[in-house]
Amino acid sequence: MNIRLTASLCLVASAASIASVPAYAQLSSNATVYASGLESPRGLKFGPDGDLYVAEAGTGGTISTVGSCAQVPPPIGSYLGGNTGRISKLDKSGNRTTVASGFPSTLAAEGDLQGVADIAFLNGTLYAVTAGGGCSHGNASSPNVIARVDTKSGSWKAIANLSQFVQSHPAAYPDLGDFEPDGVFYSLIAHDNRLYTLEPNHGQLFSSSASGDLREELDISRQQGHIVPTSIAVNDGRFYIGNLGLFPITPESSKIMSFNIGACPWPFLFGFGCGDEVQKLRLSGSRYGFTTVVALDFGPDGLLYALELNDAAGFPAPPFGVGKVVRLNRAGDIEDVATGLSVPTGMTFGPDGYLYVSNFGAAPSGQILRISVH
């Protein structure tokens, strides 16, 4: 049975189940709590001002659109929508202030929350991608978007309608069990004057200019099938994409793929040139051995770091203390960096060389961890 990304982030547990968390749930000694009290924290980035900006899914809402549009089937759907998604800023002491609010947020029938999924700075301007928008999420008048955010006034404006674009550009091989009419976007990065975002359940990579010019960069489903790609990083012009995989969890079954901007094959097949294909991303390599990857980043040491949601086999619930940060060392081996994380959902390196991770990302009261990687 295939379970989608959002279901895997559900963190509904009784007091008894929380009390039974094994000793492994303790954070490794190199991880400390930097901030707490965030509402389902997801992706995070440092801004030009040196402060840490955090995307928050919010708390969902009470609006139902059942009967008005296509719905996500049970047990995930239907959703209840609202406008409780927000972006927060943490100062150097970990104190939180709200940067912008009123983003679409949604609560699934099984308890999961989606809202602001990730953020990125492009030429000094803050942008956000949402995952809780669209009629199928109970937000008929608020589609999933890439939004430009004014960090001074707190206002924001949609520059690209992702709900509309994902519907007009369907994946080659969508999985019916994980299909989302409005998409559930997860990662956002800025590169070469464009913003790149992944839709995991459809398996597509999209990009947008600052003016909202959208295009599909890569249909991962066409190359890889349904693998639930969640995370993206860029290093030396090469794109790296990691995948969550399917449930039940099979440890070490996820991978990180590298993609280059494609060049024309030589000689040209059948005498045809490449045309627009010269801009396409082409798979150049992959590394298996990871488990449930939800974020990627390159450290100041030049090594590739991966955030793993859960490394326990099967359907572990609740998933406390089984998340970790790993890295690919110079010998090509995967090694643990930090363990004992609970539903980690995003990470970024700070200018201080520490790694900052969203922890308890599916809980109403989430944390940001500060991790030494040395």
Please report, for each region that a protein language model flagged, where it lies by residue.
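Short loop/turn segments that connect beta-strands within beta-propeller blades
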Residues: L90-N95, D150-G154, S208-D213, N260-C264, ...
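Generic structural signal for coil-to-beta-strand starts
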Residues: D51, N95, G124-Y127, V145, ...
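Short loop/turn segments immediately following the C-termini of beta-strands
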Residues: A57-T59, A131-G133, S141, P200-N201, ...
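Surface-exposed loop and turn segments in beta-propeller and other repeat-based domains
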Residues: N95-G111, G154-P181, R215-I227, L269-G289
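Residue position within the beta-strands of beta-propeller blades
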Residues: Y53-A57, G61, Y127-T130, T197, ...
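Blade-loop segments of beta-propeller domains
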Residues: C69-L90, R96-A120
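A short loop-to-beta-strand structural motif that recurs across blades of beta-propeller domains
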Residues: P75-Y79, N83-S88, N144-A147, Q204-S207, ...
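Beta-rich, blade/repeat-based domains predominating
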Residues: G37-D49, T84, S105-T125, V166-L195, ...
